[in-house]
Curated annotation (Swiss-Prot):
Keywords: Acetylation, Chromosome, DNA-binding, Isopeptide bond, Methylation, Nucleosome core, Nucleus, Ubl conjugation
Domain of life of the organism encoding this protein: Eukaryota
Localization terms from the record: Nucleus; Chromosome
Subunit structure: The nucleosome is a histone octamer containing two molecules each of H2A, H2B, H3 and H4 assembled in one H3-H4 heterotetramer and two H2A-H2B heterodimers. The octamer wraps approximately 147 bp of DNA.
Short name of one Pfam family: Histone
Modified residues (N,N,N-trimethylalanine): A2
GO molecular function: DNA binding; protein heterodimerization activity; structural constituent of chromatin
Cross-link (Glycyl lysine isopeptide (Lys-Gly) (interchain with G-Cter in ubiquitin)): K115
Function: Core component of nucleosome. Nucleosomes wrap and compact DNA into chromatin, limiting DNA accessibility to the cellular machineries which require DNA as a template. Histones thereby play a central role in transcription regulation, DNA repair, DNA replication and chromosomal stability. DNA accessibility is regulated via a complex set of post-translational modifications of histones, also called histone code, and nucleosome remodeling.
UniProt-recorded name of the protein: Histone H2B
């Protein structure tokens, strides 16, 4: 026996009225994980990193960034200027990082800014 067909009225689907509710989207959190991993592979190609260690490194970089930004903004306000320049960032790095580490950070930062400037022109 063939299955019986339902009446035509029963086949129509009931459409719901559009609602103003939005779906909860997963909020993306931006991390430095890919950059940490790239540097790790440059320095030690055969070494891996755990999620916990990656989270610690990410927190360290975020903290360092915040400290440098805060110190730079203080220097701008102290000098009664309105524009944050590379000079204030370099001075903040000198104040926050000890000796050789500060010199190395400044040279790497200068190199990165030069590379960026030449690529945008």
């Amino acid at each position: 026996m063939a299955p019986k067909k339902a009446p035509a009225a029963a086949e129509k689907k009931v459409k719901k009225a559009p609602t103003t509710e939005k779906k909860n989207k997963k909020k993306r959190s931006e991390t430095f994980a890919i950059y940490i991993f790239k540097v790790l592979k440059q320095v030690h190609p055969d070494v891996g990193i755990s999620k916990k260690a990656m989270n610690i490194m990410n927190s360290f970089i975020n903290d360092s960034f915040e400290r440098i930004a805060l110190e730079s903004s203080k220097l701008v306000r102290f000098n009664k200027r309105r524009t944050l320049s590379s000079r204030e960032v370099q001075t903040a790095v000198k104040l926050l990082l000890p000796g050789e580490l500060a010199r190395h950070a400044i040279s790497e930062g200068t190199k990165a800014v030069t590379k960026f400037s030449s690529s945008t022109n």
